[in-house]
From Swiss-Prot:
Entries under PANTHER family matching the protein: HISTIDINE BIOSYNTHESIS BIFUNCTIONAL PROTEIN (PTHR42945), HISTIDINE BIOSYNTHESIS BIFUNCTIONAL PROTEIN HIS7 (PTHR42945:SF1)
Disulfide linkage: none
GO MF annotation, one: ATP binding
HAMAP family xref list: HisE
Domain of life: Bacteria
Family according to the record: Belongs to the PRA-PH family.
Keyword Amino-acid biosynthesis among UniProt keywords: yes
Identification of the protein by name: Phosphoribosyl-ATP pyrophosphatase
Taxonomic lineage: Bacteria, Bacillati, Actinomycetota, Actinomycetes, Kitasatosporales
A single GO cellular-component term on record: cytoplasm
UniProt entry keywords in alphabetical sequence: Amino-acid biosynthesis, ATP-binding, Cytoplasm, Histidine biosynthesis, Hydrolase, Nucleotide-binding
Organism: Streptomyces griseus subsp. griseus (strain JCM 4626 / CBS 651.72 / NBRC 13350 / KCC S-0626 / ISP 5235)
Subcellular location: Cytoplasm
């Protein structure tokens, strides 16, 4: 799998949410299920990041962080929040 930047992933997720089939695209499926379902995944992934960071190695923690970032970006897409909207608060 090719590495993606945060911005490239966000653009890809926007496209999948807009054009993807919920039956074949996890992103489209999550957006279709709504903010509540996505929020549950964000909380789950955040807990997994914590556990991996505390009890596992760097690679496991990095993988869990990537999954958390994915779900946070799906939430952003579902709510119509742009990267610039978030960057304004950094």
């Amino acid at each position: 799998m090719a590495n993606k930047t945060f911005e490239e992933l966000f653009t890809e997720l926007q496209l999948k949410a807009a054009e993807g089939d919920p039956a074949t695209s996890r992103t489209a499926e999550l957006v279709d299920k709504g903010v509540h379902a996505i929020g549950k995944k964000v909380v789950e992934e955040a807990a997994e990041v914590w556990m991996a960071a505390e009890y596992e190695g760097k690679e496991a923690a990095a993988e869990e962080i990537s999954q958390l970032l994915y779900h946070v970006q799906v939430m952003m897409v579902a709510r119509g929040i742009s990267l610039d909207d978030v960057y304004a608060h950094l």
